[in-house]
Amino acid sequence: MIDQIWANAAIESCLKQGIDHFFLAPGSRCTPLTLAVARQKQAHVIQHFDERGLAFAALGYARATGRPGVFICTSGTAVANAFPAVVEAAMESVPMLLFTADRPFELHGTGANQAIDQLEIFGNYVKLFSNLSVPADGSSIQGQQESAFLDSILEQAFTATKDGPVHLNWMFHEPFTIENEKPDSLACSPSDGNTGDVADHSSISLPTIEVVGNVLIVLGGCRPEEAEQALELAGQLNCPILSDVTSGLRVGSFELPTEFNLPVPDTILHLGGRIVSKTWHQWTASLADRDVNMIHVTRRARRSIRTV
């Protein structure tokens, strides 16, 4: 079946790019992708029935390693369960590949089970979306052209995921398995384009920053080595550091103040991703009438300075 050939090509391409962790929530419609992963001995598989939790596991893996994990699920509401993790990945530019199975076009709008509109279901929260309508007949010239299209899409996906999540939606036809199946000459060659090393996920880059007066560092979502850099910087500046829950920075105690009671600093240096603490945002809002410089250094080294 051409469905299986395409799935095999996609998984082999991932492995060629060093992407070897697959977060699998198996279901009938994603059988081709499941079999493709199972056939690869070097694939590391994390399997669970809870798509929401599994998507967050893929997100956590990428945060810790800088490598995208591949989230694989069946069609319908299984896809929607990944939405929270996709949003977080988008907000923090965390790499993530989503391979979702779907019913073919002819089964949409017919009342077929678990057939929902999955086209661009994650909206602007993904860096790239492609709907892959696998050709039912793999012997045509059109099918050969579409296999070249698949190679191109995979190359684009590997590049785009360096900056956030990428969604490839696979419209698979039944039957998913055939006894004694023999792949024909239409098999897609795994993508080996020069797309760079997806594992090179940029760390927080600390440009030369001139700060004056009392400094307070606040640390958002970041990788472990970035948290160590922040601690070193705090030591160099001899200033306190506040760690958001997303930072992963370990603390020696776990007090949970209902409000901040801190001396007002001259400069607030925000490193890493966004801060989710409501108390923090309330405190910074209270500084509206104070002359405080806010410097934000993100993972991509885009620096913004504002006065609060």
Predicted regions and their residues:
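Glycine-rich phosphate/diphosphate-binding loops that line cofactor/substrate pockets in enzymes
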Residues: A9-I19, Y61-G66, L154-K162, I204-V215, ...
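Conformationally flexible catalytic loops at phosphate/diphosphate-handling active centers
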Residues: F149-V212
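A short helix->loop->beta-strand "cap" motif at the edges of active sites that frequently abuts
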Residues: Q42-A43, V94, N238-C239, L287-M294
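Thiamine diphosphate
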Residues: T31-E106, T267, V276
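Glycine-rich, acidic loop regions that bind phosphate or pyrophosphate groups
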Residues: T100-L154, S243-V308
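Glycine-rich beta-alpha junction loops
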Residues: R103, W170-F176, G221-R223, T246, ...
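Anionic-ligand anchoring segments at beta-strand to alpha-helix junctions in alpha/beta enzyme folds, i.e.
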Residues: D20-A57, I72, G196-R274
